[in-house]
Amino acid sequence: MSVDPACPQSLPCFEESDCKESSPMPVICGPEENYPSLQMSSAEMPHTETVSPLPSSMDLLIQDSPDSSTSPKGKQPTSAENSVAKKEDKVPVKKQKTRTVFSSTQLCVLNDRFQRQKYLSLQQMQELSNILNLSYKQVKTWFQNQRMKSKRWQKNNWPKNSNGVTQKASAPTYPSLYSSYHQGCLVNPTGNLPMWSNQTWNNSTWSNQTQNIQSWSNHSWNTQTWCTQSWNNQAWNSPFYNCGEESLQSCMHFQPNSPASDLEAALEAAGEGLNVIQQTTRYFSTPQTMDLFLNYSMNMQPEDV
């Protein structure tokens, strides 16, 4: 009877030893109802073992992700360096452009030809390039640059030079009569006729010159009339003197037939007539007065006779 109860007590001890060997966790010995829990824990253990590799794979992905993120960063400097290298390669290409240095004789020939003809044909440029030992492109570019320089120079200096010409060269080069016309043309290059007409026709100098011309013409006309009057005076004086001589001769013809008293009266009358005629010719020069005195002297002779 005493042996039977000891046997069941020994069995749990063996089981405890087995349990300790199977798992490190302490297991309380008890009835058989605790066995299913042990089986469940043993079933869960492989599940945990199968799930445990997943974090390791995530860790690998996390470790790979920085590598992938750093890889483009390593590539970007290479692209920037390539672009900088390309730019450095392009800069020397621009500096490699060399300008052709022309000699003095070549420049003289080119300038002479440019002054005569600014635009050359293809054949003319080829001939000129052969003469100067230059290429066609060099001659062409030189003419293009020279045309641009001349246009720029004209654009910058033409208004200043035109004003200087109008102010300085207008007075000495043209006489006073045509200065107004010249200034009108330069001041008003667009061709406004009212402005030009006002300057030319209303100019005081031009009107004064026309007045002077008119006065000069009047003076010349007066001198001509005065000369004609003096000539007429000479022409009228000569017949009066002749008339006086004829009266004296007529008186002399009547000497033998007339008495002494009549002769003296005729001489006195003739002398008075001559004195009157001489005085009138001095103070009067019109033909009307001369006609009057001529008639008077002619009328006096038959009465005295």
UniProtKB/Swiss-Prot annotation:
Q: Does the keyword Metal-binding apply?
A: no
Chain positions covered by the region annotation Disordered? 1-96
Cysteines joined through disulfide linkages? none
Q: What is the effect of changing residue 16 to A?
A: Found in ethnically diverse individuals
Could you confirm whether the keyword Transferase appears in this record? no
Instruction: Point out the DNA-binding stretch(es).
Output: 95-154
One Pfam short name: Homeodomain
Q: Where is the composition biased (Polar residues)?
A: 65-82
* Region span, 8 X repeats starting with a Trp in each unit: 196-240
- GO process annotations (BP): cell differentiation; positive regulation of cell cycle G1/S phase transition; positive regulation of cell population proliferation; regulation of transcription by RNA polymerase II; stem cell population maintenance
GO cellular component terms listed in the entry, alphabetical order: intracellular membrane-bounded organelle; nucleoplasm; nucleus
Note the InterPro entries from the entry: Distal-less_Homeobox_TF (IPR050460), HD (IPR001356), Homeobox_CS (IPR017970), Homeodomain-like_sf (IPR009057)
The sequence repeat units are at: 196-200, 201-205, 206-210, 216-220, 221-225, 226-230, 231-235, 236-240
| Localisation per UniProt entry | Nucleus
Do you know which Gene3D superfamilies this protein is assigned to?
Homeodomain-like
List GO molecular-function terms, semicolon-separated: DNA-binding transcription factor activity, RNA polymerase II-specific; RNA polymerase II cis-regulatory region sequence-specific DNA binding
- Main location group: nucleus
Give me the ranges of the annotated region Sufficient for strong transactivation activity: 241-305
Spell out the residue ranges making up region: Sufficient for transactivation activity: 196-240
- Identify the keywords attached in UniProt to this record, alphabetized: DNA-binding, Homeobox, Nucleus, Repeat, Transcription, Transcription regulation
The UniProt function text for this chain reads: May act as a transcription regulator. When overexpressed, promotes entry of cells into S phase and cell proliferation.
The family classification in the record reads:
Belongs to the Nanog homeobox family.
Task: Identify this protein by name.
Answer: Homeobox protein NANOGP8
Organism of provenance:
Homo sapiens (Human)
